[in-house]
Regions:
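Histidine-centered, transition-metal-coordinating active-site segments
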Residues: 2-179
Length: 180
């Protein structure tokens, strides 16, 4: 997630970076389960990220025919809802209702338990599914191929990336990663 901060602080606006507050940078750095956001904004980003990922991943898995809506366990759908719209509505309102007038951001135990259970179910049935793993392998190979190509052909990078090497002394490996 350091790359996410690098993008907003160094790469955005053609190398000028964005003038973000400490709270927003904290949210970006600590939006995954491994980080511990120090600010309310960071905690909101963490919850938002979890909600977005689970719903997008369910939607992607259904469109990719890895699962169907009927495959989703009732114990989770009964709490979180049957559609993306329902799940978003329930989770967002649950956070609002459980965080109002409190010093931190909370989700009710039932909704949090269902969301955690849904995530575990997704790991078993989607993320570790051979079809999904095959796509992951192809995506990784594509990134490696692009990386190796641009290391040999830095002259084909957009000018703003080539300039990072010339004016800032950035190493080509770093610039190629930034571009990809």
């Amino acid at each position: 997630f350091k790359q996410s901060v690098r993008i907003v602080e160094v790469l955005e606006k053609k190398g000028q970076g964005l003038n973000l507050t400490k709270e927003v940078r904290d949210g970006i750095l600590n939006h995954r389960t491994s980080g511990n956001p120090a600010t309310l904004e960071g905690k909101i980003v963490r919850f938002s990220d979890k909600i977005a990922y689970i719903n997008h991943d369910i939607d992607d898995a259904i469109r990719g025919k890895i699962i169907t809506e009927k495959d989703i366990p009732r114990e989770f759908a009964d709490v979180l809802g049957d559609t993306v719209k329902d799940r978003l509505n329930i989770m967002i309102h649950d956070i609002i209702n459980n965080s109002m007038d409190k010093p931190s951001i909370f989700m009710s135990p039932d909704v949090e338990r269902a969301m955690r259970g849904m995530r575990e179910w997704m790991f078993e049935h989607v993320y570790r599914n051979p079809a999904a793993k095959g796509e992951e392998g192809r995506a990784q190979q594509l990134i490696v191929t692009l990386y190796e190509y641009y290391l040999k052909h830095v002259d084909e990078l957009p000018e703003e990336f080539r300039m990072m090497m010339e004016t800032r002394g950035e190493k080509k490996e770093r610039v190629v990663c930034d571009y990809i």
